[in-house]
Amino acid sequence: MASDNGKSFLDKFAEVSAKVGNQVHLRSLRDAFATITPLYILAGIAVLINNVVFPLFPLDAAGLANLQTWGSAITLGTLNVSAIILAGLIGYSLAKNKRFDNPLACMVVAISAFVIMMPQQITATLAATSPLLTDKITSAEVTGALSTANTGTNGLFSAIIIALLSVSLFIKISGVEKLKVKLGEGVPPAVSNSFNVMIPMLLNLAVFALAAALLAVCAGTDLCTIISTCISNPLKSIMNAGPWAVILIYTLANLLFCVGIHQSTISGATVEPILTMLIVDNMATFADGGTIQPDHYMNMQIVNSFALIGGSGCTLMLLLDTLLFSKNKASETVSKMAILPGLFNINEPVIYGYPIVYNLPLMIPFVLLPDLFIGITYGLTCAGIISPCIAQVPWTMPPVINALLATGFDWRAGVWQAIEIVIGMAVYLPFMKISEKAIAKQEALAE
């Protein structure tokens, strides 16, 4: 009876979690971040080469600056416009997930609405060669320009909210038949679709322009600043108040994986967008020669590199234990097939083939080991024992190399990741033995 109640609770938990993960706006957000991730990885590689590799060359300051123009150009086209790109991707993904027949129009609306809500006047720092620069005058108010503070990494949260609002409103208005322009049956579909959304698009952007004007005239501010102050900064602060919020979400997410539903259903729709923003901030800071602050030590890369070794639940350690110490032929067979994908952090064969799903002994280290590593790695970073993550690297990068790249080639991070593997093997081993004994008893009863 107790077992049935426990399973019933897990089933209900999985059902609720699946509904949360499949919520259309959260799913669209997850899809958009998945699409933009290669751009962030390219930016991370450029940041590493620009700030770690190029300075090793025997060049004077001018020569190094010329060489670093390459990486700066990549930063300009990736990190510095990432909010604009993300806004468009969210608009497109939301349209696809809502099965709207003109997703490109939604992309246009999202980008336009986002730019409309930006400040029309920005403060720019004067260059060292500017004739206007004096001891008292170091900046100037500029109109007709966009600030990378809004178009880049700092504007990601504004892009998310404005894109979701504008596209949701646009899709709603587009459903009103009276607002569609009928051109007749002989008109090509592409032309007809563009005219169908013309009036809804005009109305939508007019509403956002009115809101921007009212905020500027009546309050002397803009929506991007309000979102950053009231929503983005507090949420980032919660993520960096300690590892506890991240640990809680990944505990729930890995519990979900234990009943057969992918952990990204929860983590991908909740904390990962915020954690991704934090590592993107770190890349921009490092590219500018700045120092990573403690409130950015917790980010997506610290989770990927140090808490997902071999994939969710750090299952690479289980595979190594099985190959070295197991006497169960079925487990050995699965491990031999899964070890190569596991080295590249792909572990679905382990989750469903070993299996982890509904295997109570293995569920315990699967859930708790990543939590342990998140907490310890965060503590080591705060203590200055390992460097903070400054680059987003491909999640399929093998262990040790992964940690070295993420921290700007800090050898201590690579050593710590190797130690994690040893710790993980020690933690998994007794639970693997218990699981094998349980399987042996079940097989004996079946006979």
Give the ranges of each region predicted by the language model:
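Early transmembrane hairpin of solute transport permeases
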Residues: 18, 22-180, 357
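Membrane-embedded translocation segments of transport machinery
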Residues: 212-218, 222-326
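Hydrophobic alpha-helical transmembrane segments
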Residues: 73-86, 151-158, 239-259, 294-313, ...
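Juxtamembrane interface elements at the cytosolic ends of transmembrane helices
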Residues: 3-12, 165-186, 210-227, 266-267, ...
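Transmembrane alpha-helical segments and their short flanking loops
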Residues: 2-20, 59-68, 130, 139-140, ...
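Transmembrane alpha-helical segments in integral membrane proteins
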Residues: 82-97, 163-173, 252-259, 265, ...
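Core transmembrane alpha-helical segments of multi-pass membrane transporters/permeases
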Residues: 24, 28-49, 157-160, 164-168, ...
